[in-house]
C-alpha cells in the first residue's frame, strides 16, 4: 500500500487560454468551467472573458489601417443544472452576458455609424432534453430537444427617450463635417445644417436627420429578445442505417417598434455554417447547397426555419477513427421581418457527404450539395456547392 502512488486527478475543471492574431485582427480569451459547482451535485458553472480587435483591412491591396478598428469586449457567466423531473434527460441552463462594441472610424457598411459604442447586456435561459444513444459520434437512437430565450432589459420603457422623434431634434440632424459645396456649386462652411438634397439650411428643423447619429442613440444599449427551438431525432432504420430528422426555428423581436430591431445578433442562413465573421454577434445557420450567408439579406434575418432529413451509414466506428457516409435533403429560409414569414417558402437542396472523427482532430467532413432554388435576388438556381466541415455537426 505504501508503494501505491496513483496518478493525480482533478475534478473535471477546465481552464482555457486562447491567443490569436494576424496583421489585421487580434483575439484574447480566457474561460473556466466547473462541472461540480458546490461539490455535491452535477451543476456546471462557467465564466469566460474575451477581447478582440479588428482593424480595417483592404482585401484587394491587403493594406491594414490600424487607426480604424472595431473592438469587442465580452464577459459571460453561466450555470447549468440537470433536472430529475420529468426525467433525468433534462437540463436547465442560464447565463448572463455582456458585450461592449467599440467602433473607431470603422466605416465598412456593417452599420450606419462608424464611430461610437453599443452595449449588449442579456439574460439567456434554455431548457434541453438529450437522450441520444449510444455513441455520441454516431447516435443510433434517441433525440435532442432544446428551447431557449435571450432577453435584454426593455430600456425604452423607462429611459424617457422618444425614439420616434429623434430625427426631429437638432443634435441628430445632418451637419457638414468640413467645408463643402452644394449641388448648385455654392460653398458652405463646416458645421452647416444640410437638407436631404445636400443644400445648407439656416433652420435646423429643415435639415435632414442623420441616420448615423439616430442609430447610434438607438443602439447605445441594445434592446431585443430572441427565441429559438430545435428538435433532433435519430431513428434506426435497418442494422446500422440511421435516419436523422432535424427541425429548427428562430425569431428575434423588439420591445419598442419606434426603436426597431437592432442590427446585431441576427440570423444568417446558408452554406457550411462556419462563423468566420461574427463581429456583430450574428448566428450562422447551415443550409447546404447554397453559398455562405446567401439566404439572408446583407443585414441578416430576424426569423428563420430549417428542416433536414439525413440518412447515415457507418464505414467504421473504431475508437481511433469513426467514419460514416451520408445523404440528405434540406430546406430552409430566412426573412427580414415576421410579417414576411412563410413556412412553405423555402430554398431546397440535396446531397451526399462523408464524416471522419479522430480524437486528435475532432470532426472533419465534406459535403457535395445541389441547391434546387435560386438565392434571393437571383434567377438562376444555386446548383452544386462543396462544403467543408470542421468541428461542427449538421
Q: Which residue ranges define each predicted feature?
A:
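Short, glycine/acidic-rich beta->alpha junctions
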Residues: 24, 71, 223-227, 345-348
Amino acid at each position: 500500500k505504501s508503494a501505491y502512488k496513483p496518478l493525480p486527478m482533478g475534478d473535471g475543471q477546465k481552464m482555457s487560454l486562447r491567443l490569436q492574431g494576424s496583421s489585421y485582427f487580434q483575439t484574447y480569451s480566457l474561460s473556466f468551467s466547473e462541472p461540480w459547482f458546490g461539490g455535491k451535485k452535477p451543476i456546471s458553472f462557467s465564466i469566460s472573458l474575451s477581447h478582440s480587435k479588428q482593424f480595417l483591412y483592404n482585401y484587394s491591396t491587403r493594406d491594414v489601417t490600424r487607426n480604424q478598428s472595431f473592438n469587442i469586449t465580452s464577459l459571460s457567466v453561466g450555470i447549468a443544472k440537470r433536472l430529475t423531473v420529468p426525467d433525468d434527460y433534462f437540463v436547465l441552463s442560464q447565463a448572463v452576458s455582456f458585450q461592449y462594441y467599440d467602433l473607431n472610424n470603422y466605416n465598412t457598411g456593417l452599420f450606419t455609424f462608424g464611430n461610437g459604442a453599443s452595449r449588449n447586456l442579456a439574460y439567456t435561459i434554455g431548457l434541453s432534453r438529450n437522450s441520444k444513444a449510444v455513441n455520441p459520434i454516431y447516435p443510433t437512437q434517441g433525440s435532442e430537444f432544446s428551447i431557449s430565450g435571450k432577453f435584454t432589459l426593455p430600456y425604452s420603457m423607462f429611459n424617457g427617450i422618444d425614439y420616434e422623434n429623434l430625427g426631429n431634434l437638432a443634435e441628430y440632424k445632418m451637419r457638414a463635417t468640413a467645408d463643402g459645396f452644394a449641388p448648385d456649386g455654392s460653398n458652405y462652411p463646416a458645421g452647416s445644417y444640410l437638407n436631404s438634397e445636400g443644400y445648407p439650411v439656416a433652420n435646423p428643423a429643415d435639415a435632414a436627420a442623420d441616420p448615423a447619429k439616430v442609430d447610434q442613440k438607438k443602439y447605445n444599449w441594445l434592446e431585443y429578445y430572441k427565441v429559438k427551438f430545435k428538435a433532433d431525432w435519430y431513428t434506426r432504420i435497418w442494422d446500422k442505417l440511421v435516419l436523422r430528422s432535424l427541425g429548427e426555428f428562430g425569431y428575434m423581436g423588439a420591445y419598442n417598434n419606434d426603436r426597431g430591431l437592432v442590427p446585431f445578433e441576427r440570423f444568417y442562413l446558408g452554406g457550411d455554417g462556419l462563423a468566420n465573421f461574427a463581429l456583430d454577434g450574428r448566428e450562422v445557420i447551415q443550409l447546404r447547397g447554397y453559398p455562405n450567408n446567401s439566404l439572408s439579406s446583407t443585414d441578416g434575418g430576424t426569423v428563420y426555419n430549417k428542416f433536414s432529413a439525413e440518412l447515415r451509414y457507418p464505414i467504421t466506428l473504431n475508437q481511433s477513427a469513426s467514419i460514416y457516409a451520408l445523404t440528405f435533403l434540406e430546406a430552409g429560409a430566412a426573412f427580414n421581418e415576421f410579417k414576411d414569414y412563410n413556412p412553405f417558402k423555402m430554398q431546397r437542396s440535396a446531397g451526399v457527404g462523408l464524416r471522419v472523427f479522430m480524437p486528435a482532430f475532432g470532426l472533419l467532413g465534406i459535403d457535395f450539395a445541389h441547391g434546387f432554388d435560386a438565392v434571393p435576388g437571383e434567377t438562376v438556381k444555386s446548383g452544386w456547392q462543396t462544403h467543408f466541415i470542421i468541428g461542427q455537426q449538421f
